[in-house]
Swiss-Prot record:
This is Probable transcriptional regulatory protein EF_2866. SUPFAM superfamilies: YebC-like. Its main location: cytoplasm. GO terms for cellular component: cytosol. The lineage of its organism: Bacteria, Bacillati, Bacillota, Bacilli, Lactobacillales. The keyword Cytoplasm applies. It comes from Enterococcus faecalis (strain ATCC 700802 / V583). Pfam families: TACO1_YebC_N (PF20772), Transcrip_reg (PF01709).
Length: 239
């Protein structure tokens, strides 16, 4: 699964290069998580893990605090979690996760991003069966075997643990993602480089020429949409 981690790193690097957009998206995600339950992260697991993920993107504390304070107030913006599936050039597959307060706007924007760049939006389930929902947790370390043994002792369903470039990368079943992160904290691991629930493709495709150019443009347009939180795909992008 090493290549999957490489793809995560590439996506994180691209997002880190556009901080204002990342901060705005996390602000909404934190607001929604805080509004859906207790605004105290210690009493709201969903909020706690969104904050943990935000920290891996270096989202400043004041952005996090402002979103939580907004949730405590009288504002009551209604957001919907949506997933769109579609096809890019030459058989590439794309899943788009969105968080929106205007479903019609988001659907139109996502459809246009596909259609104008050699792709087309499909129905629910059109491509998701070719992806595996996977928890991915990364942190500094070099003993993958020790971490695997520790997590197995905690009865956590682990798909794989690898060491790569001074990082331990843990791949879990989605239902054990949060349990694994809590167990690692109990072990004294306080700083994570990645905490993601990713739709990992079962197989990747390689694009070339115009197909690659159109796909990368489509990806940029989708990720620039304010309502889009994540874009998953099965393309092995060149480094």
């Amino acid at each position: 699964m090493g290549r999957k981690w490489a793809n995560i790193k590439e996506k994180k690097a691209a997002k880190d290069a556009n901080n204002s957009r990342v901060y705005a998206k996390f602000g909404i995600e934190i607001y929604v998580a805080a509004k859906s339950g207790d605004p105290d992260p210690h009493a709201n697991q969903k909020l706690r893990f969104v904050i943990e993920r935000a920290k891996t993107y270096n989202v400043p504390k004041h952005i996090i605090d402002r979103a939580i304070e907004k949730a405590k107030g009288s504002a009551d913006e209604q957001y919907s979690e949506l997933r769109y599936e579609g096809f890019g050039p030459n058989g590439s597959m794309v899943i788009v996760d969105a968080l929106t307060n205007n479903v019609n706007r988001t659907a139109a924007d996502v459809r246009a991003a596909f259609g104008k760049n050699g792709g087309n939006m499909g129905v629910s389930g059109a491509v998701s069966y070719m992806f595996d929902n996977t928890g991915i947790i990364g942190f500094a370390g070099d003993d993958a075997d020790e971490i695997l043994e520790y997590l197995m002792e905690k009865d956590i369903d682990v798909r794989d643990v690898v060491e790569e470039d001074g990082q331990i990368i843990v791949y879990t079943e989605p239902e054990d993602f949060h349990h694994a992160q809590e167990a690692l904290k109990e072990k004294g691991i306080e700083e994570f480089t990645v905490t993601e629930l990713e739709m990992v493709p079962q197989n990747e495709v390689t694009l070339e020429g115009d197909d690659l150019g159109n796909f990368e443009k489509m990806l940029d347009v989708l990720e620039d949409l304010e309502d889009v939180q994540k874009v998953h795909h099965n393309v092995d992008l060149p480094e």
